[in-house]
Structures are given as structure tokens and as C-alpha cells.
Regions:
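Acidic/histidine-rich helix-loop elements
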Residues: 34-44, 64-73, 106-116
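Serine-esterase "nucleophile elbow" of acetyl-processing enzymes
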Residues: 20-64, 80-88, 92
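Solvent-exposed, charged interface segments at domain starts and junctions
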Residues: 8, 21-24, 107-109, 117
Length: 165
């Protein structure tokens, strides 16, 4: 009987500990999501403001960096930093495409451009697979369109990375 009570108490304490933990959201992406130093620029990435929409029970960690693509975020080691901080149950918000369109949407020499249906897709799959392998939850965020317009004033897509997902 003592063993059953001990097992039950251990289970309840473990469960209470799990529910007491904060929910953590890690954001990865480019300048449209990145943090900026206040008072030095009027620019703000949406990831910088995300915490304002949640209670203190949710913690936002923004890893997004200006100029990064799905390729450069990995190749510069930023993704490794995120993975080292992931815990089971965490969320990873993934938004790339803005800089993946560099080099006319091809695998570029600058280390940023990716082809929409090959390398771009491969990097996105990597983020999903590695996030899930660590017990976390990947969430794709629709890329923000670039400010390219036709003469008629409609949005003119320069790449296909928004549909490459």
C-alpha cells in the first residue's frame, strides 16, 4: 500500500511540475521578425512585440536576425543555439522567405538565396524534423510579402518562396 501511495504522490508531483512550467515559444526568421534596439531605430520586427500579446505564462525567445534566410540561419549556427534551448512541449515559430528570394530565388553565392522547391523546402523540412525530434512543435508563419508592386499598384511577387512550402 505504501508503494502505491508513493507512486501516486510521485505522479501527482510530476504532473503538477509539468503544468507549472511556462510555455515557451522560440521564433526563427529574418528582419521582419527580429528584435531591434529601441531608441536607435523605428524599425520593429513582429517577433519583438509578440510577448505583448501573451500573459506571463508564455515566454517568447526571439532568435530572428535581419538578413537571414532559411539557409544562412542554419549555416551561421543560429539554429544550433535554438536547438540547444528547446524542451519538449516548446513551440518554434518559423518564418523565412524574405531573404531566400535573393539571387533571383536560386542557391546564391552570398549564402542566402534558395530555390523554392528544392533547397528552401529542404531547410524548412530540416527545421520541422529537428524540432519534432526534440519533442517541440513547429509552426509555420506565412512570410511577409516584399514591397514590390506592378505599375497598376498590385503586389508583384519576385519569387515563389511563399508557395514553396
Amino acid at each position: 500500500m505504501k508503494k502505491i501511495i508513493l507512486l501516486l504522490a510521485t505522479t501527482l508531483i510530476s504532473t503538477a511540475h509539468i503544468h507549472a512550467q511556462k510555455l515557451t515559444v522560440h521564433t526563427i526568421g529574418d528582419s521582419t521578425m527580429a528584435d531591434y534596439v529601441e531608441n536607435t531605430t523605428r524599425t520593429r520586427g513582429w517577433g519583438e512585440m509578440l510577448q505583448e500579446f501573451f500573459t506571463s505564462d508564455v515566454r517568447i525567445i526571439n532568435y530572428a536576425r535581419g538578413g537571414r534566410s532559411s539557409r544562412s540561419f542554419t549555416e551561421e549556427g543560429l539554429w544550433d543555439k535554438v536547438k540547444s534551448n528547446l524542451n519538449p512541449g516548446d513551440y518554434v515559430f518559423i518564418q523565412f522567405a524574405h531573404n531566400d528570394e535573393k539571387e533571383q530565388g536560386k542557391d546564391g553565392a552570398d549564402g542566402r538565396g534558395t530555390a523554392p522547391w528544392t533547397t528552401y523546402k529542404t531547410f524548412l523540412e530540416q527545421y520541422v524534423d529537428e524540432t519534432e525530434a526534440l519533442g517541440a512543435n513547429p509552426v509555420f508563419i506565412t512570410p511577409i510579402v516584399r514591397r514590390y508592386f506592378t505599375k497598376a499598384g498590385t503586389i508583384s511577387p519576385k519569387g515563389c518562396h511563399d508557395i514553396g512550402i
